[in-house]
Swiss-Prot record:
Encoding gene per record: rhgA
Modification after translation: The N-terminus is blocked.
Protein name according to UniProt: Rhamnogalacturonase A
Enzyme class, broadest EC rank: hydrolase
EC number per UniProt: 3.2.1.171
Disulfide feature: C39-C65, C217-C234, C340-C346, C368-C377
Domain of life: Eukaryota
Family matches, as InterPro entries: Glyco_hydro_28, Pectin_lyas_fold, Pectin_lyase_fold/virulence
Main location: secreted
Source organism of the structure: Aspergillus aculeatus
GO biological process: cell wall organization; polysaccharide catabolic process
Amino acid sequence: MRALFLLALGSIPALVSGQLSGSVGPLTSASTKGATKTCNILSYGAVADNSTDVGPAITSAWAACKSGGLVYIPSGNYALNTWVTLTGGSATAIQLDGIIYRTGTASGNMIAVTDTTDFELFSSTSKGAVQGFGYVYHAEGTYGARILRLTDVTHFSVHDVILVDAPAFHFTMDTCSDGEVYNMAIRGGNEGGLDGIDVWGSNIWVHDVEVTNKDECVTVKSPANNILVESIYCNWSGGCAMGSLGADTDVTDIVYRNVYTWSSNQMYMIKSNGGSGTVSNVLLENFIGHGNAYSLDIDGYWSSMTAVAGDGVQLNNITVKNWKGTEANGATRPPIRVVCSDTAPCTDLTLEDIAIWTESGSSELYLCRSAYGSGYCLKDSSSHTSYTTTSTVTAAPSGYSATTMAADLATAFGLTASIPIPTIPTSFYPGLTPYSALAG
């Protein structure tokens, strides 16, 4: 339970001072829920033998405790052969201290929580985990189930748990509100379609999370408002993003702050191709990157998605500031790449204190198209007519040098062998400790 009005709003520009619209997290503590009623899955048929299907036991324990209580999954190894859909909870929690191993082969969601309020999923030891064994699918060029999906969940938190090797996406928050996600490690295979965290909804704080994969690190989708994402470690990932954005996009009041990105697709991307609607009031602040394919990549003609009918998604009032580090090859992929729709130009953009230098060669490019505002290759004009400009930079920008993280991976995890369960880091951004100490 956190009253996040106490965040230092004075340090945030006025355009995004309302990034959170109220308090986030569960309304009742896990200890209070446990004191009301505790439903130990061992009492409902679970056996920690990594063989007996734990799905029915979790479902039964939830039914007994969903109206007020705590579902307890003790330490030990459990096999999940049938997926669990947990619905209609109120003032309930799941304490995951054991490790759940996927043995089932169905599609869908291994663990789904829906239509629930005042909810908490956590490990008291920071060692609770779900191992998806996605490599079994990926080695054959296929995908399977997603690990965790929350749908229409309000006043919630997910923390101190580990998600590993999802057959598809790792963690999705679908139309959720007033939530907090923190102190997590997510580790997946090195290919697309294995998203780390996808979130759409309202008033959600995601912080102190490490993601390894090759797709979304922490990504906001539409519709979304008042989302705060900070202290994120994209450690050989796809990188953080917004989108993809299509018809009737509605995204506003989004803050990403203190994001460290290593050997990823990009430091941040906003991706669309046609479509309609708006993205407004966005702050991308304090980013460090090394070894990434792209750095800032706003692409209104993103070729990896099929074009959507419409003039394009209108981006307005976007601020990018205090970015440092290096990029793999800034001459082939501009560190500043702002490509907006000619028929829906970006307006009121601010690029400030961006210092990214190429790791290969001695020059890099900045590219802007139909993008208006201040800084670098943006045009400052009220006409908002289409244009494209490319500038060549031949000297390293002042202040680009930035620290690395000791836990930066030397190589990605492959697709043909089991990915080990990691420990949750004690830092997710250089020089910062988590807002909340790890549990246990």
